[in-house]
Amino acid sequence: MTFDSANASKPLSVVLAGGGTAGHVSPLLAIADAIREKRPEAAILAVGTPSGMETRLVPAAGYELATIDRVPFPRRPSADLVKLPARLSGAVRQARRILEEARADVLVGVGGYVCTPMYLAARKLRIPIVIHEANMKAGLANRVGARFSNHVAVAFAGTRLRGARHVGMPMRRAISGLDRAVAAPAARAALGLDAQRPALIVTGGSSGALSINRAITAALPALAAAGVQTLHITGNGKAVKDDDGGLLTADGYRQVEYVDGMENVYAAADVLLARAGAGTVSEVAAVGVPAVFVPLPIGNGEQALNAAPLVAAGGAVMVDDKDLSPEWLRSELIPLLTDRSRLNEMARKSEALGIRNADQRMADLVLEAVSA
Protein backbone atom coordinates (compact mmCIF):
# COMPACT_ATOMS: atom_id res chain seq x y z
CA MET A 1 0.00 0.00 0.00
CA THR A 2 1.24 3.50 -0.84
CA PHE A 3 0.65 6.35 1.61
CA ASP A 4 0.52 9.72 -0.14
CA SER A 5 -0.36 12.73 2.01
CA ALA A 6 -0.55 14.90 -1.10
CA ASN A 7 -3.42 12.83 -2.47
CA ALA A 8 -6.31 15.28 -2.70
CA SER A 9 -8.87 12.51 -3.22
CA LYS A 10 -9.10 11.83 0.51
CA PRO A 11 -9.06 14.02 3.61
CA LEU A 12 -6.07 14.13 5.91
CA SER A 13 -6.02 10.98 8.07
CA VAL A 14 -4.51 11.36 11.55
CA VAL A 15 -4.09 8.48 14.00
CA LEU A 16 -3.33 9.40 17.62
CA ALA A 17 -2.02 6.73 20.00
CA GLY A 18 -1.84 6.72 23.78
CA GLY A 19 -3.82 5.85 26.83
CA GLY A 20 -4.08 4.00 30.08
CA THR A 21 -4.34 7.10 32.27
CA ALA A 22 -5.85 10.57 32.04
CA GLY A 23 -2.28 11.86 31.83
CA HIS A 24 -2.04 10.36 28.36
CA VAL A 25 -5.62 10.78 27.19
CA SER A 26 -6.07 14.46 28.06
CA PRO A 27 -3.22 15.77 25.87
CA LEU A 28 -4.20 13.35 23.10
CA LEU A 29 -7.71 14.82 23.00
CA ALA A 30 -6.40 18.39 23.17
CA ILE A 31 -4.17 17.70 20.16
CA ALA A 32 -7.08 16.09 18.30
CA ASP A 33 -9.28 19.14 18.92
CA ALA A 34 -6.57 21.51 17.69
CA ILE A 35 -6.04 19.47 14.51
CA ARG A 36 -9.78 19.44 13.86
CA GLU A 37 -9.89 23.21 14.35
CA LYS A 38 -7.12 23.74 11.77
CA ARG A 39 -8.27 21.00 9.38
CA PRO A 40 -12.02 20.41 9.88
CA GLU A 41 -12.09 17.80 7.11
CA ALA A 42 -9.46 15.60 8.79
CA ALA A 43 -10.33 12.02 9.69
CA ILE A 44 -9.12 11.47 13.26
CA LEU A 45 -8.80 8.07 14.94
CA ALA A 46 -7.53 7.39 18.46
CA VAL A 47 -5.84 4.13 19.43
CA GLY A 48 -5.67 2.87 23.01
CA THR A 49 -6.03 -0.23 25.14
CA PRO A 50 -9.30 -2.07 25.79
CA SER A 51 -9.19 -1.32 29.53
CA GLY A 52 -7.80 2.21 29.92
CA MET A 53 -9.60 5.47 30.65
CA GLU A 54 -9.60 6.15 26.91
CA THR A 55 -12.49 3.71 26.46
CA ARG A 56 -14.70 6.26 28.23
CA LEU A 57 -13.00 9.59 27.54
CA VAL A 58 -12.33 9.29 23.80
CA PRO A 59 -15.91 8.46 22.68
CA ALA A 60 -17.24 11.09 25.10
CA ALA A 61 -15.09 13.67 23.28
CA GLY A 62 -16.59 12.67 19.94
CA TYR A 63 -13.74 10.60 18.50
CA GLU A 64 -13.59 7.02 17.28
CA LEU A 65 -11.40 4.64 19.29
CA ALA A 66 -9.60 1.52 18.07
CA THR A 67 -7.79 -0.75 20.53
CA ILE A 68 -4.78 -3.03 20.52
CA ASP A 69 -3.46 -5.40 23.14
CA ARG A 70 -1.64 -3.93 26.11
CA VAL A 71 2.05 -4.91 26.01
CA PRO A 72 3.89 -3.89 29.20
CA PHE A 73 7.67 -4.12 29.23
CA PRO A 74 8.84 -6.06 32.33
CA ARG A 75 11.58 -4.23 34.24
CA ARG A 76 13.15 -7.43 35.59
CA PRO A 77 13.46 -11.07 34.46
CA SER A 78 10.12 -12.88 34.63
CA ALA A 79 7.77 -15.15 32.69
CA ASP A 80 6.31 -12.03 31.09
CA LEU A 81 9.73 -11.16 29.70
CA VAL A 82 9.87 -14.52 27.90
CA LYS A 83 6.45 -13.86 26.37
CA LEU A 84 7.31 -10.30 25.33
CA PRO A 85 8.52 -10.94 21.74
CA ALA A 86 5.36 -12.83 20.76
CA ARG A 87 3.08 -10.30 22.47
CA LEU A 88 4.85 -7.35 20.87
CA SER A 89 4.77 -8.98 17.44
CA GLY A 90 1.03 -9.55 17.75
CA ALA A 91 0.41 -5.96 18.84
CA VAL A 92 2.49 -4.63 15.93
CA ARG A 93 0.31 -6.64 13.52
CA GLN A 94 -2.80 -5.13 15.12
CA ALA A 95 -1.26 -1.65 14.86
CA ARG A 96 -0.34 -2.12 11.21
CA ARG A 97 -3.87 -3.22 10.36
CA ILE A 98 -5.32 -0.11 12.04
CA LEU A 99 -2.94 2.23 10.22
CA GLU A 100 -3.62 0.58 6.86
CA GLU A 101 -7.39 0.64 7.30
CA ALA A 102 -7.26 4.30 8.35
CA ARG A 103 -4.99 5.11 5.38
CA ALA A 104 -3.03 7.12 7.91
CA ASP A 105 -1.01 10.11 6.75
CA VAL A 106 0.61 10.60 10.16
CA LEU A 107 0.83 8.91 13.56
CA VAL A 108 0.84 11.03 16.72
CA GLY A 109 1.99 9.27 19.91
CA VAL A 110 1.72 10.60 23.46
CA GLY A 111 3.17 7.61 25.31
CA GLY A 112 1.77 4.60 27.09
CA TYR A 113 1.57 0.88 26.38
CA VAL A 114 0.08 1.18 22.89
CA CYS A 115 2.72 3.51 21.49
CA THR A 116 5.66 1.15 21.02
CA PRO A 117 3.79 -1.22 18.65
CA MET A 118 2.20 1.76 16.90
CA TYR A 119 5.61 3.39 16.36
CA LEU A 120 7.09 0.14 15.04
CA ALA A 121 4.18 -0.40 12.65
CA ALA A 122 4.29 3.19 11.39
CA ARG A 123 8.01 2.91 10.75
CA LYS A 124 7.48 -0.22 8.64
CA LEU A 125 4.78 1.56 6.65
CA ARG A 126 6.90 4.72 6.32
CA ILE A 127 4.22 6.84 7.94
CA PRO A 128 5.53 10.04 9.57
CA ILE A 129 5.64 9.87 13.37
CA VAL A 130 5.03 12.82 15.71
CA ILE A 131 5.74 12.38 19.42
CA HIS A 132 4.69 14.31 22.51
CA GLU A 133 6.37 13.46 25.81
CA ALA A 134 4.51 14.74 28.86
CA ASN A 135 6.98 13.95 31.65
CA MET A 136 10.34 15.46 32.48
CA LYS A 137 11.77 11.92 32.35
CA ALA A 138 10.74 10.38 29.04
CA GLY A 139 8.96 7.03 29.05
CA LEU A 140 10.27 3.94 27.29
CA ALA A 141 7.80 4.04 24.40
CA ASN A 142 8.67 7.60 23.47
CA ARG A 143 12.39 6.95 23.84
CA VAL A 144 11.96 4.18 21.26
CA GLY A 145 9.73 6.26 19.00
CA ALA A 146 12.06 9.26 19.04
CA ARG A 147 14.61 7.16 17.14
CA PHE A 148 12.20 7.03 14.20
CA SER A 149 10.91 10.61 14.24
CA ASN A 150 12.08 14.06 13.23
CA HIS A 151 9.09 15.64 14.96
CA VAL A 152 9.48 15.22 18.73
CA ALA A 153 7.90 17.61 21.24
CA VAL A 154 8.15 17.81 25.03
CA ALA A 155 6.12 19.43 27.79
CA PHE A 156 9.17 20.35 29.90
CA ALA A 157 12.23 22.16 28.59
CA GLY A 158 14.62 19.81 30.42
CA THR A 159 13.30 16.55 28.95
CA ARG A 160 16.05 14.70 27.15
CA LEU A 161 14.87 13.31 23.81
CA ARG A 162 16.72 13.51 20.53
CA GLY A 163 15.74 16.59 18.53
CA ALA A 164 13.00 17.58 20.97
CA ARG A 165 11.15 20.89 20.73
CA HIS A 166 9.69 22.46 23.87
CA VAL A 167 5.99 23.07 23.19
CA GLY A 168 4.38 22.65 26.63
CA MET A 169 1.45 20.44 27.61
CA PRO A 170 -1.64 20.34 25.37
CA MET A 171 -4.69 20.94 27.55
CA ARG A 172 -8.41 21.52 27.28
CA ARG A 173 -9.47 25.01 26.23
CA ALA A 174 -11.54 25.38 29.40
CA ILE A 175 -8.23 25.33 31.27
CA SER A 176 -5.83 26.99 28.83
CA GLY A 177 -8.26 29.89 28.39
CA LEU A 178 -9.04 30.27 32.11
CA ASP A 179 -8.99 33.73 33.71
CA ARG A 180 -8.87 32.84 37.40
CA ALA A 181 -9.91 36.25 38.70
CA VAL A 182 -12.97 36.39 36.46
CA ALA A 183 -13.97 32.76 37.00
CA ALA A 184 -13.38 32.57 40.77
CA PRO A 185 -16.82 33.70 42.07
CA ALA A 186 -18.77 31.25 39.91
CA ALA A 187 -16.24 28.47 40.53
CA ARG A 188 -16.46 28.87 44.29
CA ALA A 189 -20.24 28.84 44.15
CA ALA A 190 -20.20 25.68 42.01
CA LEU A 191 -17.88 23.94 44.48
CA GLY A 192 -19.78 25.06 47.58
CA LEU A 193 -17.01 27.35 48.84
CA ASP A 194 -17.34 30.67 50.65
CA ALA A 195 -16.47 33.63 48.44
CA GLN A 196 -14.27 35.35 51.05
CA ARG A 197 -12.42 32.76 53.13
CA PRO A 198 -8.98 31.47 52.02
CA ALA A 199 -9.53 28.23 50.11
CA LEU A 200 -7.30 25.17 50.18
CA ILE A 201 -8.19 22.53 47.61
CA VAL A 202 -6.61 19.11 48.07
CA THR A 203 -6.44 16.32 45.52
CA GLY A 204 -4.42 13.17 45.08
CA GLY A 205 -5.58 12.59 41.53
CA SER A 206 -8.32 10.30 40.22
CA SER A 207 -7.16 7.40 42.42
CA GLY A 208 -6.67 9.48 45.56
CA ALA A 209 -3.70 9.59 47.93
CA LEU A 210 -4.09 8.06 51.38
CA SER A 211 -1.05 9.81 52.87
CA ILE A 212 -2.36 13.21 51.80
CA ASN A 213 -5.84 12.36 53.06
CA ARG A 214 -4.52 11.39 56.51
CA ALA A 215 -2.38 14.49 56.94
CA ILE A 216 -5.11 16.87 55.86
CA THR A 217 -7.81 15.42 58.07
CA ALA A 218 -5.51 15.52 61.11
CA ALA A 219 -4.79 19.21 60.44
CA LEU A 220 -8.42 20.26 59.99
CA PRO A 221 -8.81 21.90 63.44
CA ALA A 222 -5.75 24.10 62.82
CA LEU A 223 -6.92 25.00 59.31
CA ALA A 224 -10.37 25.97 60.58
CA ALA A 225 -8.87 28.00 63.44
CA ALA A 226 -6.86 29.97 60.86
CA GLY A 227 -10.05 30.74 58.93
CA VAL A 228 -9.16 28.41 56.05
CA GLN A 229 -11.84 26.45 54.21
CA THR A 230 -10.84 23.11 52.70
CA LEU A 231 -12.29 21.27 49.73
CA HIS A 232 -10.94 17.73 49.78
CA ILE A 233 -11.14 15.73 46.55
CA THR A 234 -10.46 12.31 48.02
CA GLY A 235 -10.50 10.14 44.90
CA ASN A 236 -13.03 7.54 43.81
CA GLY A 237 -13.79 5.10 46.62
CA LYS A 238 -11.47 6.97 49.01
CA ALA A 239 -14.03 8.92 51.06
CA VAL A 240 -12.69 9.88 54.50
CA LYS A 241 -14.70 8.36 57.34
CA ASP A 242 -15.04 9.37 60.98
CA ASP A 243 -14.58 7.04 63.95
CA ASP A 244 -18.16 5.84 63.62
CA GLY A 245 -17.78 4.95 59.95
CA GLY A 246 -19.73 7.92 58.68
CA LEU A 247 -18.54 10.54 56.23
CA LEU A 248 -16.12 12.87 58.01
CA THR A 249 -17.45 16.38 58.60
CA ALA A 250 -15.70 19.36 60.19
CA ASP A 251 -15.91 23.13 60.36
CA GLY A 252 -14.90 24.64 57.03
CA TYR A 253 -14.35 21.21 55.48
CA ARG A 254 -16.09 19.60 52.54
CA GLN A 255 -15.13 16.39 50.80
CA VAL A 256 -16.07 14.99 47.40
CA GLU A 257 -14.70 11.96 45.61
CA TYR A 258 -14.41 13.58 42.20
CA VAL A 259 -14.76 16.95 40.47
CA ASP A 260 -15.70 17.02 36.81
CA GLY A 261 -13.81 19.97 35.38
CA MET A 262 -10.55 20.98 37.05
CA GLU A 263 -10.94 24.51 35.69
CA ASN A 264 -13.30 25.25 38.59
CA VAL A 265 -10.73 23.91 41.04
CA TYR A 266 -7.97 26.06 39.58
CA ALA A 267 -10.18 29.16 39.63
CA ALA A 268 -11.42 28.65 43.18
CA ALA A 269 -8.21 27.63 44.97
CA ASP A 270 -5.94 30.03 46.80
CA VAL A 271 -3.59 27.04 47.13
CA LEU A 272 -3.77 23.63 45.46
CA LEU A 273 -2.17 20.71 47.31
CA ALA A 274 -1.67 17.82 44.91
CA ARG A 275 0.53 15.13 43.46
CA ALA A 276 2.95 16.28 40.76
CA GLY A 277 1.71 14.52 37.67
CA ALA A 278 2.85 16.16 34.44
CA GLY A 279 -0.64 17.36 33.55
CA THR A 280 -1.29 18.91 36.95
CA VAL A 281 2.08 20.69 37.04
CA SER A 282 1.63 22.04 33.51
CA GLU A 283 -1.95 23.20 34.08
CA VAL A 284 -1.06 24.87 37.38
CA ALA A 285 1.76 26.77 35.67
CA ALA A 286 -0.36 27.78 32.69
CA VAL A 287 -3.11 29.38 34.76
CA GLY A 288 -0.99 30.57 37.70
CA VAL A 289 -2.27 28.58 40.69
CA PRO A 290 -0.03 28.64 43.79
CA ALA A 291 0.62 24.98 44.54
CA VAL A 292 2.09 22.62 47.10
CA PHE A 293 3.26 19.46 45.37
CA VAL A 294 3.64 16.12 47.14
CA PRO A 295 5.32 13.87 44.55
CA LEU A 296 4.29 10.23 44.40
CA PRO A 297 6.93 8.36 46.41
CA ILE A 298 7.04 5.33 44.11
CA GLY A 299 8.09 4.80 40.50
CA ASN A 300 11.09 6.42 38.86
CA GLY A 301 10.91 9.77 40.64
CA GLU A 302 9.37 11.47 37.63
CA GLN A 303 6.87 13.49 39.65
CA ALA A 304 9.57 15.30 41.63
CA LEU A 305 11.35 16.02 38.34
CA ASN A 306 8.11 17.36 36.85
CA ALA A 307 7.63 19.83 39.70
CA ALA A 308 11.26 20.92 40.10
CA PRO A 309 11.35 23.75 37.50
CA LEU A 310 8.18 25.38 38.85
CA VAL A 311 9.44 25.10 42.43
CA ALA A 312 12.81 26.58 41.42
CA ALA A 313 11.01 29.49 39.75
CA GLY A 314 9.11 30.25 42.96
CA GLY A 315 5.69 29.31 41.66
CA ALA A 316 5.21 26.25 43.87
CA VAL A 317 6.40 24.48 47.00
CA MET A 318 7.39 20.81 47.14
CA VAL A 319 7.33 18.50 50.16
CA ASP A 320 8.29 14.82 50.23
CA ASP A 321 5.47 12.40 50.93
CA LYS A 322 7.27 11.16 54.05
CA ASP A 323 7.52 14.73 55.38
CA LEU A 324 3.88 15.66 54.84
CA SER A 325 2.41 15.75 58.34
CA PRO A 326 -0.13 17.76 60.33
CA GLU A 327 2.83 19.60 61.87
CA TRP A 328 4.18 20.59 58.43
CA LEU A 329 0.75 21.77 57.35
CA ARG A 330 0.43 23.91 60.48
CA SER A 331 3.92 25.43 60.27
CA GLU A 332 4.27 25.84 56.49
CA LEU A 333 0.93 25.66 54.70
CA ILE A 334 -1.24 27.81 56.96
CA PRO A 335 1.18 30.79 56.89
CA LEU A 336 1.23 30.51 53.09
CA LEU A 337 -2.56 30.43 52.81
CA THR A 338 -2.89 33.60 54.87
CA ASP A 339 -0.14 35.56 53.08
CA ARG A 340 -1.88 37.23 50.14
CA SER A 341 1.26 39.02 48.97
CA ARG A 342 3.22 35.77 48.73
CA LEU A 343 0.35 34.00 46.96
CA ASN A 344 0.14 36.76 44.36
CA GLU A 345 3.89 36.53 43.76
CA MET A 346 3.71 32.74 43.38
CA ALA A 347 0.85 33.08 40.90
CA ARG A 348 2.83 35.59 38.85
CA LYS A 349 5.95 33.41 38.77
CA SER A 350 3.92 30.31 37.97
CA GLU A 351 2.10 31.87 35.04
CA ALA A 352 5.36 33.27 33.66
CA LEU A 353 6.62 29.69 33.27
CA GLY A 354 3.41 28.22 31.87
CA ILE A 355 2.41 27.65 28.24
CA ARG A 356 -1.23 27.97 27.21
CA ASN A 357 -1.11 27.19 23.47
CA ALA A 358 0.67 23.82 23.40
CA ASP A 359 -2.27 22.23 21.59
CA GLN A 360 -1.85 24.67 18.70
CA ARG A 361 1.90 24.11 18.64
CA MET A 362 1.36 20.36 18.42
CA ALA A 363 -1.22 20.68 15.64
CA ASP A 364 1.26 22.79 13.67
CA LEU A 365 3.95 20.15 14.22
CA VAL A 366 1.61 17.41 12.95
CA LEU A 367 0.82 19.37 9.79
CA GLU A 368 4.52 20.07 9.33
CA ALA A 369 5.26 16.33 9.51
CA VAL A 370 2.60 15.57 6.90
CA SER A 371 3.97 18.11 4.45
CA ALA A 372 7.66 17.25 4.99
Swiss-Prot record:
Q: Which GO terms describe its cellular component?
A: plasma membrane
Q: In which pathway does it act?
A: Cell wall biogenesis; peptidoglycan biosynthesis
Localization terms from the record: Cell membrane
Please give the catalytic activity noted in the UniProt record.
di-trans,octa-cis-undecaprenyl diphospho-N-acetyl-alpha-D-muramoyl-L-alanyl-D-glutamyl-meso-2,6-diaminopimeloyl-D-alanyl-D-alanine + UDP-N-acetyl-alpha-D-glucosamine = di-trans,octa-cis-undecaprenyl diphospho-[N-acetyl-alpha-D-glucosaminyl-(1->4)]-N-acetyl-alpha-D-muramoyl-L-alanyl-D-glutamyl-meso-2,6-diaminopimeloyl-D-alanyl-D-alanine + UDP + H(+)
Read off the CDD domains from this record. Answer: GT28_MurG (cd03785)
The main location is membrane
Q: Which UniProt keywords apply?
A: Cell cycle, Cell division, Cell membrane, Cell shape, Cell wall biogenesis/degradation, Glycosyltransferase, Membrane, Peptidoglycan synthesis, Transferase
Q: What is its EC number?
A: 2.4.1.227
Q: How does it sit in the membrane?
A: Peripheral membrane protein
Q: Which residues bind UDP-N-acetyl-alpha-D-glucosamine?
A: T21, A22, G23, N135, R172, S206, Q303
In the record, biological process GO terms are:
carbohydrate metabolic process; cell division; cell wall organization; lipid glycosylation; peptidoglycan biosynthetic process; regulation of cell shape
Q: Which residues form the signal peptide?
A: none
Tell me yes or no: is Cell cycle among this UniProt entry's keywords: yes
* Top-level EC class as recorded in UniProt: transferase
- List the Gene Ontology MF annotations in alphabetical order: UDP-N-acetyl-D-glucosamine:N-acetylmuramoyl-L-alanyl-D-glutamyl-meso-2,6-diaminopimelyl-D-alanyl-D-alanine-diphosphoundecaprenol 4-beta-N-acetylglucosaminlytransferase activity; undecaprenyldiphospho-muramoylpentapeptide beta-N-acetylglucosaminyltransferase activity
UniProt-listed Gene3D superfamilies: Glycogen Phosphorylase B
The record's Pfam families line, in alphabetical order, gives: Glyco_tran_28_C (PF04101), Glyco_transf_28 (PF03033)
- Which superkingdom is the protein from? Bacteria
User: What does this gene product do?
Assistant: Cell wall formation. Catalyzes the transfer of a GlcNAc subunit on undecaprenyl-pyrophosphoryl-MurNAc-pentapeptide (lipid intermediate I) to form undecaprenyl-pyrophosphoryl-MurNAc-(pentapeptide)GlcNAc (lipid intermediate II).
In the record, the note on similarity to other proteins reads: Belongs to the glycosyltransferase 28 family. MurG subfamily.
The protein's name: UDP-N-acetylglucosamine--N-acetylmuramyl-(pentapeptide) pyrophosphoryl-undecaprenol N-acetylglucosamine transferase
Highest classification ranks of the organism: Bacteria, Bacillati, Actinomycetota, Actinomycetes, Micrococcales
Name of the coding gene: murG
